[in-house]
Amino acid sequence: MTTFRELGLSDSLLQSVESMGFEEATPIQAETIPHALQGKDIIGQAQTGTGKTAAFGLPLLDKVDTHKESVQGIVIAPTRELAIQVGEELYKIGKHKRVRILPIYGGQDINRQIRALKKHPHIIVGTPGRILDHINRKTLRLQNVETVVLDEADEMLNMGFIEDIEAILTDVPETHQTLLFSATMPDPIRRIAERFMTEPQHIKVKAKEVTMPNIQQFYLEVQEKKKFDVLTRLLDIQSPELAIVFGRTKRRVDELSEALNLRGYAAEGIHGDLTQAKRMSVLRKFKEGSIEVLVATDVAARGLDISGVTHVYNFDIPQDPESYVHRIGRTGRAGKKGIAMLFVTPRESGQLKNIERTTKRKMDRMDAPTLDEALEGQQRLIAEKLQSTIENENLAYYKRIAEEMLEENDSVTVVAAALKMMTKEPDTTPIALTSEPPVVSRGGGSKKRGGNGGGYRDGNRNRSRDGRGGDGRNRDRNRDGRNRDGNRDRNREGSRDGNRGRRGEGQGRPGSSNGRGERKHHSRKPQA
């Protein structure tokens, strides 16, 4: 393992890193930082949870001259949440060097951002639309920028930000250094690299290095109409301290959060149609524990860093395997254990295989719990808590009443009454969620799998390949935000000012695409 002291970082940054409790660099950090400190362009392929923020953040901060009152580096991120998270991380790392960091993103008052820009920040972290907005207003000048970071470049492609990114890169000095990080390298991202980067060092963290040993992963085969009852039974059995439930569309998130509240769970949802103030309010309540279940879309959850998340429930299977890795990365952090559950409908077995190939890890099968099993599971959890109380607490104050009860009742009856009082009675309030179309992918079919419970998948052959219809046109209907040419649709989450009408994340008429029709997987051809 490589220590941070071996990487050639300045003393002030080492002081910050050590105060944060880090000594050894992760593989992506150990390979990236030395090249970046030499000024080389970098293409880093890494998933969430690998430490890539510090991989680009440390060399970025190391180059900053705090005596200069100008913007010297920009970090471009796909979502507001990720921009905020990266900004907070860079602030912690650059604290002892006194580097001024400013996050800018849609949904925040632009006049407030203009006032903050006049205070001469050294590094800007922002979403493409809002950065470009400030460039066009001439409230952000990039003539002194030395380093540009593209974080989660493939996600920015998916959201249609390619034109904005090209416009920003055209506005910075030709001599700047570019650090591009992306889980995958589709052709439009490769063209960006060819056009704007000079002999980049390609650093790739293999999938086996990004799977998360602290996370137990299970899948459940369940019909679409039964998913909600299965979810509530799992919540009753597992009693998570903090849980995130992922839905594929905004409509799904709204309906799920409302349905969970009807069944007695403290739940709220976040997605791109919420104002920034509302999203921050929901996240604050979740961190404080006043909300026990957070329901989120993939885009809204990007960059979330919430400690203490014990369970992740993939209510809808994600559209792509990379999103699955991002989702489950919300748990199992800082050495703690986490549990991830994936709901798979009969026609989605091919997508499950795609996820397993990407993570290089076979998931264990779990049978969907029955109502009786949910009640018994609750009782066993309560029994464990009672046993822990017996072993660890002083019960002297309670024994007199207990002895009086035992004079009139046998001990089994007393314990049974205690279990009944502490067990949540099942709520069978009727819930009708709008069905979402399955994510059908190549690789399905009838195969027997091992794991906990075994069982067969649907033996019917999948009617489409790679999500395409019989005419070969792509029908992945719920991916976030790409229009036909891979460029940004302005009526979508993450628009320039965050206030325009937004669609996307599968919102639209039931059974339709995300409002923009079928997508082609290409972007505008870069200019020579």
Swiss-Prot record:
EC number: 3.6.4.13
Extent of Basic and acidic residues compositional bias: 458-506
Binding residue positions for ATP: A46, Q47, T48, G49, T50, G51, K52, T53
Pfam families: DEAD (PF00270), DeaD_dimer (PF25399), Helicase_C (PF00271)
Residue ranges of domain Helicase ATP-binding in the record: 33-203
Highest rank taxon of the organism: Bacteria
Molecular-function GO term, any one: RNA binding
Gene Ontology annotations for the cellular component aspect, listed alphabetically: bacterial nucleoid; cytosol; ribosome
Enzyme superclass (EC): hydrolase
Protein function: DEAD-box RNA helicase possibly involved in RNA degradation. Unwinds dsRNA in both 5'- and 3'-directions, has RNA-dependent ATPase activity.
Region of interest called Disordered, as start-end residue ranges on this chain: 428-528
Gene: cshA
Keywords: ATP-binding, Cytoplasm, Helicase, Hydrolase, Nucleotide-binding, RNA-binding, Stress response
Assigned protein family: Belongs to the DEAD box helicase family. CshA subfamily.
Designated name of the protein: DEAD-box ATP-dependent RNA helicase CshA
Catalytic activity from the UniProt record: ATP + H2O = ADP + phosphate + H(+)
Chief location bin: cytoplasm
Motif segment (DEAD box): 151-154
All copies of domain Helicase C-terminal, residue ranges: 214-374
Location in or out of the cell: Cytoplasm
Motif (Q motif): 2-30
Subunit structure: Oligomerizes, may be a member of the RNA degradosome.
Transmembrane segments: none
Gene Ontology terms describing biological process: response to cold; RNA catabolic process
